[in-house]
Amino acid sequence: MAIKTLKDLLAEGVEGRHVLVRSDFNVPLNDDREITDAGRITASLPTIKALVDNGARVILMAHLGRPKGEVNEKFSLAPVAEALSEALGQYVALAGDVVGEDAHERANGLNDGDVLLLENVRFDPRETSKEEAERGEFADQLVALTAENGAFVSDGFGVVHRAQASVFDVAQRLPHYAGTLVEKELEVLGNKVASAPERPYAVILGGAKVSDKLGVIEALATKADKLIIGGGMCYTFLAAKGINVQKSLLQEEQINKCKELLEAYADKIVLPVDLVAAAEFASDAENKIVAIDEIPEGWMSLDVGPKTVEKFAEVLATSKTVFWNGPMGVFEFENFSAGTRGVAEAIIAATANGAFSVVGGGDSAAAVRLLGLDEDGFSHISTGGGASLELLEGKNLPGVSVLES
């Protein structure tokens, strides 16, 4: 069944109606609680602006971090309310609670075109409860904020893979629609990448833990033409080939699984040929470029080397579809950012050459911004890390399937 979208809701009319919007405002903050990457906030603006311009009374729901079901000032959405006020050019009020007295009072007091941000939904343990009855109770209280004739817009793509109250259960209780962002993500990832990628199709996976991405690797190895593996997860694959990776990040319990994958997909999996080894895990650590089997004793690799970037770039240059998720090294340390930068630049070059490229959210999107790369050089930068991977894996996304019902 087709999913109704924001366009459908606007055609029905939203003037004077309370519209609950699930956004993704899970943005990184520094120690002074300043937002260091507002990408997700920027991505949420088209939906919010459209509702405001059409006279809706907008109630935003979102989470930040993992407060574990308790009110914790450290995870308050106050910095987000401030950033939204600035970006929208109008005051966005922050409720002092999620479904308490203050939230109700403020929701009841909204005028057409006003925006209210509820406090972090994960301050309530029922948001992430595994018990449907508990989530349902919380969802009922969220829906109660909308008065009569309310509607729900799902626009937090980064959370659609979660069966949580504000994502899944609220949608079951109100007329529901996909926001601009979710609609675009499903179109790009679902149609252009997952269903019918133009070939050759290359996937680049990085990031720390191989265990987090084993399911993805297995699923994509059958679908992609080339599977490039870098970042912290590549060392378990190198160890599976009998290489001593010294103190590099290693998940020994996954070595046999990596061996199986290397045997099954020998023609598809592409691994590093050189590395940037460091004496310790520090931004100013003594470091040198070495072959994969020449990491000095007691040292660790913190990035892929220049020959590896060249090798990966050759694969990307001939690809027509490219999906990238996960950095190639510890890009936050300048001395170990060249691998991630080199691969990102190779993807930009492939895109300029006609390839369709997607950056799969999370750390990769953060790396693009931190390294000052041209975001327009990629066809699409996704806002969902885990969600984009699960969509490509072919998994059921609760927050999407509920919109189809």
From Swiss-Prot:
Keywords of the record: ATP-binding, Cytoplasm, Glycolysis, Kinase, Nucleotide-binding, Transferase
GO biological process terms on file: gluconeogenesis; glycolytic process
Binding-site residues for substrate, renumbered to this chain: D24, F25, N26, R40, H63, L64, G65, R66, R122, R162
CDD domains the UniProt entry points to: Phosphoglycerate_kinase (cd00318)
Localization, UniProt: Cytoplasm
SUPFAM superfamilies xrefs: Phosphoglycerate kinase (SSF53748)
Family per similarity comment: Belongs to the phosphoglycerate kinase family.
PANTHER family found in the cross-reference section: PHOSPHOGLYCERATE KINASE, PHOSPHOGLYCERATE KINASE 1, CHLOROPLASTIC-RELATED
Name this protein carries in UniProt: Phosphoglycerate kinase
Name of the gene: pgk
